[in-house]
Amino acid sequence: MIMQRINFKKFNSVGYFCLGASAVYCLIFIIYSFYWLISPYPNEYREFANIDITRMFLEGKNPYDTVNIPPFFYVYGFVMPLLTSWLYSLISFIHIDLLLFQRLIALSGTILCGWISAKEVKNQTNSIVYAFLAFSITLIVGWSMGLCVALPNTLGVFVMLLTLYKAKRIKTITDICGVSFLTILSFFIKQYFVIVCVPVFIWLLFRSKKQALYYVLFSIFCFICAASFINYLYPAFFSIAIVHHLAIASHSLSHLIKQLAVTGLFYFPLLLLFLLVVYNRYKNISGKIIISFNLGKDRNSPLIKLSEMPDIYAISVCVYFIVILRLGMHEGAYMTYIYQLFIPVLAIYTLSSIDILKKDKLKNVVLIGTVLFSLYHIGLFINIPREMNDREKSEWESLYKILDADKTKGVQIYSPLLAKYAWDNQLPVWNNGQTEYISTLQNSSVISHIFPEANKIALKNRDWQLQLHQQISTFQIPVIITDNLSFLTSSFLKQAGYCITDSVSLKAGTTPNYTVYRWIPCQVRN
């Protein structure tokens, strides 16, 4: 029955090749995802920060109350951790590890992104080949220096794609309200996903001035209501989510250029297909552009009227490319903005519109290129990294043995790579991976006036740092664990009179190895 409902296009050899290649890729993706899903080690340097806030919710604590800051700190939205804590409470009788469960939620978000991409392509082309290829390409959204990282990224991408999907099908005011709600929800998942409002608004201008106006008004109303409630419930949220989040970013033009080069090199079949589709679809567009601001009798007419209605995904490709020129300079992320924002909408639009190309040979060449480059090269060599070898695992286990011996000595762990070990062994979590971000905020009277909680956090952090430095300078901490990125630097600890007794090289995800150090007072060592 299910097979009968699908109106398959007549497959040629290229169609079978694309379908088979996508199926094999998905199988490989599932196998490697399972490996990274159950890994007891961090899949990314700051992964535990996402677990830490979920833990706070499970313990009934307010993660955005300055009482808990520092050492706790989290700059992303709360929707993913809150959802995870609620679901985790429902299945508490299963006794599943929280890290494993949150990774599973993130992986589910990846699958949902692939599903909605495939659904949109299938709706527009009625081709299972194009739909399956879109599903496979979209799986890249889950990559963040490794697979199955417990981050809110994939949930944010799913809500972003769902917003575009629903916006394209707006018919009533209720539909507009739903799209506005999803738009605002995306901000509270991870802040930059709210950018989805731009392509939605632009597209509505080509459709109906009234709908565009309603969308803006409903979105503003929804945000004001949500912000009022959240500011009451979580006093420090907006200070952290806006002020601190903007302060942590360091930017590099060379970092952006490297990512654009990778995108151009391995996604050139999709990019070429995009240009061909846009040219063929809009080459005969009327040169007359009618712009009307009259909200009277023609309020249901578009603000900008063209002979060919632009596609919301084509607009999204253009908008997100411009956005990436800014976000892509952020040195804290490599390719993730491109994978999350640009690639999904690029895949959806190009594969939905590929049949506009009349020459089958050209279409086949682009499809084969897409499979070989955009899917397999990126997928197998970047999205699916090699497994951790026995030597790398032994490094982790040797460090765990050292920490097991130090547990009763008052050890303090300042490496986020070992934050889960600290939590599992009832030790304080002194650095969850984002604790260091507290110190990035610069003093500003304007910021203090608009976001008073930001000033409170800065003052509390200063007192906490002074107390910590006092404890170190008087050797009150017998054992300190840091790494090469820790905010407790090696130079500071050496000046304070601490010496390294052990150093271990640890692998986390696909990033270069991190070096973890064990420090004790030099006088004790001597």
Language-model segments: residues:
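Perimembrane helix-loop-helix junctions
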Residues: I2-K10, V196-C222, A236, L246-S250, ...
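Hydrophobic/aromatic-rich transmembrane helices and adjacent perimembrane loops
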Residues: G156-V159, I195-V196, H330-K358
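Loop-to-helix entry region of an early transmembrane alpha helix in multi-pass inner-membrane enzymes
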Residues: L82, L90-L112
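Short acidic/glycine- and proline-prone juxtamembrane loop motifs at membrane-interface regions
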Residues: M145-L155, Y334
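Transmembrane-helix signature of polytopic, membrane-embedded enzymes
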Residues: G114-V141, V157-F158, T174, I315
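Extracytoplasmic
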Residues: H377-C522
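Extracytosolic helix-loop segments that constitute the early lumenal/periplasmic catalytic or substrate-binding loops
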Residues: A49-F72, V79, W86
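Membrane-interface alpha helices of multi-pass inner-membrane proteins
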Residues: L161, D175-Q191, C197-L204, I220-I224, ...
